[in-house]
From Swiss-Prot:
One of its GO terms (biological process) is fructose metabolic process. This is Fructose-1,6-bisphosphatase class 1. It is an enzyme of class 3 (hydrolase). Transmembrane segments: none annotated. Its cofactor is Mg(2+). Substrate binds at D131, G132, S133, S134, N224, Y257, K286. It catalyses: beta-D-fructose 1,6-bisphosphate + H2O = beta-D-fructose 6-phosphate + phosphate.
């Protein structure tokens, strides 16, 4: 028998984890942290439970009389939809049960909501409970966006200053897309970006999109061109350029815009290209830094993409207030770099 090695042999690929539950994925992720107390695992599982409960509400919205407006306005000056209120109260109720979350900043609340003064409550959560609520009555996909931070120190409770930190301090971020099926996409930054599809027959999220990676360049752009009269000249020049006919450079790009941030960003994450909600001429953006821009920036960078205001990296921006608004550009790295070059006047 020959003792010569077979140089053509290669070790088998790591087995796919497609089909594992969200709970199993979270538990496996903690195996590399021997000192883990279980608090982070429990908090992420609570967010998964919120997604299940809101899914149930969304599915029965028309029958349960929770479509339409409450007549109230939130801190953003937006008329509150009934489902917005339901989603927000569901999240606060679930996160307040186990004492792992010290406080929450929500789009629906003017101020920080303190949930626990126990020093063992190490985490704080930022959330848009139901993004795209203007689409609720017309049955277009909507979503939940969240981010998790560690509390600044072991003091008894949290205060608003705990939240005024750059997105690079996030320890987890994700979103839930309520569409033809419910999909939860989550990352802890280090282990990649993974998507879990909800199976209502067994009440579990199962891994369906493993290690999502955004393409280096895409072929679509997502922007509300109805606002073009309000854009700065550099954004208008970029918008005209991306629609020019140049086959060698892969242009024109196709337009894809729903008007629901979670839906538009999700498609961009999977297919590549660029999503942009630029500043108007005054320099003001529309999307909230803490619970919209930063979580998506954290997700896109973990998937190999880029996220920018057009002038600076989103994850480096320090919030000045809980509900600060910023411009947001997300997408394939080369597409975002093209946009930034126009903003800098290099094109």
């Amino acid at each position: 028998m020959s003792d010569q090695r077979d140089l053509s042999w290669k070790p088998p690929d790591a087995p796919s984890r497609i089909g594992i539950t969200l709970e199993t994925y979270i538990l496996e992720g903690m195996l590399g942290f021997p000192a883990a107390t279980g608090a982070f695992t429990s908090l992420l599982n609570q967010l998964g439970l919120v997604a299940k409960l809101v899914t149930s509400k969304v599915r029965r919205a028309g029958l349960a009389n929770v479509l339409g407006y409450t007549g109230q306005t939130n801190v953003q000056g937006e008329v509150v939809q009934k489902l917005d209120e339901v989603a927000n109260e569901t999240l606060l109720s679930v996160l307040g049960r186990r004492g792992h979350c010290a406080a929450v900043v929500s789009e629906e609340l003017g101020e920080m909501r303190l949930l626990s003064t126990d020093p063992r409550a190490k985490y704080i959560v930022v959330v848009d409970p139901l993004d795209g609520s203007s689409n609720i009555d017309v049955n277009i996909s909507i979503g939940t966006i969240f981010g998790v931070l560690r509390k600044s120190d072991a003091k008894m409770g949290a205060d608003p200053s705990d939240f005024l930190r750059p997105g690079r301090d996030l320890v987890a971020a994700g979103y839930v897309l309520y569409g033809s099926s419910t999909l939860l996409v989550i990352t802890t930054g280090l282990g990649g970006v993974h998507g879990f599809t909800y199976d209502p027959t067994v009440g579990e999220f199962f891994l369906s999109h493993e290690n999502i990676r955004i393409p280096e360049r895409g072929s679509t752009y997502s922007i509300n061109e109805g606002h073009s009269a309000r854009w700065p000249e550099d954004v208008r020049r970029w918008n005209a350029w991306i629609k020019e006919d140049s086959k060698p450079e892969g242009r024109p790009y196709g337009a894809r815009y729903v008007g629901s941030l979670v839906a538009d960003a999700h498609r961009t994450l999977l297919k590549g290209g660029i999503f942009a909600y630029p500043a108007d001429r005054s320099g003001q953006g529309k999307l909230r830094l803490l619970y919209e821009a930063s979580p998506f920036a954290f997700i896109f960078e973990a998937a190999g993409g880029k996220a920018s205001t057009g002038a600076e990296r989103i994850l480096d921006r320090v919030p000045r207030s809980l509900h600060e608004r910023v411009p947001l550009v997300l997408g394939s790295p080369r597409d975002v770099e093209d946009f930034e070059q126009f903003v800098r006047g290099e094109r």
